[in-house]
């Protein structure tokens, strides 16, 4: 912007509108030119400076237009604008400096200035202060932070000196206090984001490893050492040239992301939301290929940048701390290692370049001494310098491999693996792990990057070992002690997803990697086979439990045959629990815990009794009745009452439910007469939100649909529904539900009362409620898929439905089934992020499987209901 309307004589306030009308397109055209240069790949750092310079000129011209030359006021850029970095949609922060009398004398002129700048289209944020007011306001360190980066726009030497004196360390916030405050602020900010950058929609600016971390280091350096950028600290010995270069490189990466994000969002957006990720990836040139989406590549680049920034930032913060506190007297540990102010140090004369054995010795020391706060900054830097020279396991010697296995078998093994991953050592030792580092999957199911998910799985395994997982995992503490070698489970967890992103079946490819690793580390053939099998089959137990009917003896027989041994079952069960719970904080719940435990016990029994002769149906019925009878007798019920209740329950009931469920159902039925309706609800697990709902009712058109719609309206998500025919034309409905949103209060009595009220009315008038699709789900739409097959020996039709998830989905499906006059006998509801994968066993109104014509009509109706377009 080399010429603005302000270059002409000021015609007064009356001409401001014309001036703004001419200045506005100049600013727009300047942004358009910068946008074009951005798309051509020009360094973002230069574009930010050019945009700030363009706004500078407009500011000076507007100031000259509105403020008299003798006003004794000065104009300063502060904050990011003061740094000379102005992103496309960022606020323009200004400080007007002058004594109170001058402020009051020119109050109208200042108001005119700010109005004019807003009319031009600049999102200004301004403060008008005297030097003394600056000192007072700077008692808030966030205000001081903005002021220490001030840059004069219209100010003489006297004004600049006055501002510098007002916020000098002698006046407010000496360097040590400022450092401590900023470090605490950084820690609190990280905690707001769960102390990880690996979120699905990370914050480029404020998240861990984001631009704000780099700015924080810069503010500390400016206050403590008086330098304008981190590169200047190289000469002072506080930052290495390699570290400064790495931070500059990663700053450019993040700045480019943020610049592009402002452009595609057309607002000051700082989060990489799903709304913008694909568009931004395309704009930045990240293209899809057979193995990865472009958006996944872009996000991986971001996650890796954030991780590196955090590693270097941790080192610099420690060095700044030492600058203020001085060197501490070392406390000697084992030969070659010591503690300095709680930080583990490898002595310089014992640190051999590229010696991975010595690196593993460092981590062994860390694991052996709980008092260690972390690595000393000099040791961490030395490790970073030799990192690329460390050999991978397949070219390292046997001693190094043995040392790694010793770490895996030693105390705090999972903590050690986490540290090795964070510092880049694990990816160097296992290159396949480096390949998945920072790799995200563009869906709502996997909320962590592959490497972070892997580490979450390992942490869950550590909880099993410590016995602290009992609240969430009902039987892991019973199974864990049976493990012959816990390190084999850790290896399976480490490799289970390591082949993601290569194309092909990641379970099979990962099994190949796991086998090679085990053989290289001299594991026995039996141990190698176990780890390989676990990696290859790590999804099998989850799929069986969630997508098949585990009350079906054929399902149990197939699964137990695949597993083959009790040892494999123990390892697979623990790996499955750790995997599901480590995929998303919301994925693991009481129903999944119970489902996997039921499958575990059923498979264990099948293995114990022999796979050749599974127990016949009559024997299973007898055992279930006897177990339920024992429980009811303990509750004070006599045999006559028990027999009467059992007679009113379908045989299928005794094959599908656990004894304690059968006892609860039978005891509940004592209250009801033939032809009446009963609704009961209870907590399935004490101190848990999971509820079990039992409905006994005469068979009525629309019963299932009305129950499902009511549960949905009350904010409950259905995880399983079973519908059984009972004597006297009655229906048994059993639902396993969990609160899904804030409208569900979790009270079983209130839920049962609400259902009774609905079932007492006209069921055909109950309609699914309509709710908006959440923002995140709107970005993962795909065409629904409906498939049919036979079930129950050809007596029923199975529908397998895959569709984009949304609120009220199941209620809509149930309504379609009712409108088609179909009966639901079983429903399995599974949600995997944005995907709903549901199965229903149905018949027509005469209890017959669906012919082809009826199937096609149902498919059309379901697709019309579920199609996101």
Swiss-Prot record:
Protein name per Swiss-Prot or TrEMBL: Bifunctional uridylyltransferase/uridylyl-removing enzyme
Catalyzed reaction equations: [protein-PII]-L-tyrosine + UTP = [protein-PII]-uridylyl-L-tyrosine + diphosphate; [protein-PII]-uridylyl-L-tyrosine + H2O = [protein-PII]-L-tyrosine + UMP + H(+)
InterPro entries per UniProt: ACT-like_dom_sf, ACT_dom, HD/PDEase_dom, HD_domain, NT_sf, PII_UdlTrfase/GS_AdlTrfase, Polymerase_NTP_transf_dom, UTase/UR
Any Pfam family: NTP_transf_2
Summary of activators and inhibitors of this protein: Uridylyltransferase (UTase) activity is inhibited by glutamine, while glutamine activates uridylyl-removing (UR) activity.
Domain ACT: residue ranges: 692-771, 798-869
Residue stretches making up the HD domain: 450-572
Keyword DNA damage: no
Organism listed in the record: Xanthomonas campestris pv. campestris (strain B100)
One BP annotation, GO: regulation of nitrogen utilization
Family statement: Belongs to the GlnD family.
EC number: 2.7.7.59, 3.1.4.-
């Amino acid at each position: 912007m080399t010429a603005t309307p302000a270059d002409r004589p000021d015609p007064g306030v009356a001409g401001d509108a014309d001036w703004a009308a001419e200045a506005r397109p100049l600013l727009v055209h300047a942004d358009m030119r910068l946008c074009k240069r951005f798309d051509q790949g020009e360094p973002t750092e230069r574009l930010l400076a050019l945009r700030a310079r363009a706004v500078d000129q407009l500011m000076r011209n507007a100031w000259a237009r509105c403020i008299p030359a003798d006003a004794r006021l000065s104009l300063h850029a502060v904050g990011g604008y003061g740094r000379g970095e102005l992103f496309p949609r960022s606020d323009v922060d200004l400080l007007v400096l002058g004594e109170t009398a001058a402020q009051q004398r020119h109050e109208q002129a200042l108001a005119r200035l700010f109005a004019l700048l807003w009319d031009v289209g600049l999102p200004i944020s301004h403060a008008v202060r005297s030097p003394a007011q600056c000192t007072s306001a700077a008692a808030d360190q966030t205000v001081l932070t903005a002021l220490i980066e001030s840059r004069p726009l219209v100010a003489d030497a006297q004004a600049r000196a006055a501002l510098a004196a007002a916020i000098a360390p002698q006046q407010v916030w000496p360097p040590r206090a400022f450092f401590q405050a900023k470090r605490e602020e950084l820690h609190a900010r990280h905690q707001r984001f769960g102390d990880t950058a690996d979120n699905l929609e990370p914050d480029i600016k404020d998240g861990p490893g984001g631009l704000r971390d780099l700015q924080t280091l810069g503010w500390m350096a400016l206050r403590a050492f008086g330098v304008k950028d981190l590169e200047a600290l190289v000469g002072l010995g506080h930052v290495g040239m390699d570290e400064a270069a790495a931070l500059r490189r990663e700053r450019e990466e993040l700045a480019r992301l943020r610049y592009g994000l402002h452009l595609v969002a057309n607002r000051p957006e700082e989060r990489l939301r799903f709304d913008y990720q694909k568009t931004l990836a395309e704009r930045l040139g990240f293209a899809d290929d057979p193995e990865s989406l472009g958006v996944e590549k872009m996000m991986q680049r971001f996650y890796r940048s954030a991780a590196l920034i955090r590693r270097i930032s941790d080192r610099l913060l420690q060095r700044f701390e030492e600058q203020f506190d001085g060197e501490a007297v070392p406390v000697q540990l084992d030969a070659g290692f010591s503690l300095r102010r709680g930080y583990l140090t490898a002595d310089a004369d014992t640190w051999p370049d590229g010696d991975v054995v010595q690196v593993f010795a460092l981590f062994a020391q860390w694991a052996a001494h709980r008092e260690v706060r972390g690595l000393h900054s000099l040791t961490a830097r030395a490790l970073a310098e030799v990192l690329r020279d460390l050999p991978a396991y397949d070219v390292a010697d046997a001693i190094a491999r043995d040392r790694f296995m010793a770490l895996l078998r030693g105390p705090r093994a999972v903590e050690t693996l986490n540290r090795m991953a964070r510092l880049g050592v694990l990816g160097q030792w296992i290159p396949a792990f480096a390949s998945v580092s920072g790799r995200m999957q563009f869906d709502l199911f996997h909320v962590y990057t592959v490497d972070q998910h892997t580490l979450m799985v390992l942490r869950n395994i550590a909880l099993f070992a410590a016995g602290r997982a009992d609240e969430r995992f009902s039987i892991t503490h019973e199974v864990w002690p049976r493990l012959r070698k816990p390190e084999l489970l850790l290896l399976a967890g480490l490799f289970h997803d390591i082949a993601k992103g290569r194309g092909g079946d990641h379970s099979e490819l990962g099994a190949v990697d796991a086998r090679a690793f085990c053989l290289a580390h001299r594991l026995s053939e039996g141990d190698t086979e176990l780890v390989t099998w676990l990696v290859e089959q790590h999804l099998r137990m989850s799929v069986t439990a969630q997508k098949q009917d585990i009350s079906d003896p054929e399902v149990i027989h197939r699964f137990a045959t695949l597993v083959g041994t009790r040892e494999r079952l123990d390892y697979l069960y623990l790996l499955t629990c750790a995997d599901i719970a480590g995929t998303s904080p919301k994925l693991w719940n009481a129903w999944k815990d119970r489902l996997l435990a039921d499958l575990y016990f059923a498979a264990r029994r099948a293995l114990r009794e022999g796979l050749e002769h599974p127990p016949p149906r009559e024997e299973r019925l007898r055992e279930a009745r006897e177990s339920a009878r024992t429980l009811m007798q303990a509750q004070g019920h006599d045999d006559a009452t028990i027999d009467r209740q059992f007679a009113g329950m379908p045989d299928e009931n005794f094959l599908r439910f656990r004894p304690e469920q059968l006892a609860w159902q039978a005891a509940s039925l004592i209250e009801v007469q033939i032809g009446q309706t009963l609704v009961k609800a209870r907590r399935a697990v004490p101190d848990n939100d999971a509820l079990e709902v039992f409905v006994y009712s005469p068979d009525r058109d629309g019963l299932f649909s009305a129950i499902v719609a009511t549960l949905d309206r009350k904010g409950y998500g259905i995880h399983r529904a079973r519908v059984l025919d009972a004597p006297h034309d009655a229906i048994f409905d059993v639902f396993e539900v969990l609160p899904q949103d804030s409208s569900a209060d979790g009270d079983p009595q209130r839920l049962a009362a609400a259902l009774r009220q609905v079932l007492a009315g006209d069921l055909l008038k109950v309609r699914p409620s309509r709710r908006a699709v959440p923002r995140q789900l709107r970005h993962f739409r795909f065409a629904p898929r409906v498939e049919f097959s036979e079930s129950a020996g050809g007596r029923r039709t199975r529908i397998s439905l895959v569709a984009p998830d949304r609120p009220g989905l199941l209620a809509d499906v149930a309504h379609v089934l009712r409108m088609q006059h179909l009966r639901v006998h079983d429903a399995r509801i599974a949600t995997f992020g944005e995907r709903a994968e549901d199965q229903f066993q149905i018949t027509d109104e005469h209890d017959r499987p669906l012919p082809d014509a009826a199937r096609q009509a149902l498919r059309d109706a379901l697709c019309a209901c579920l199609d996101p377009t």
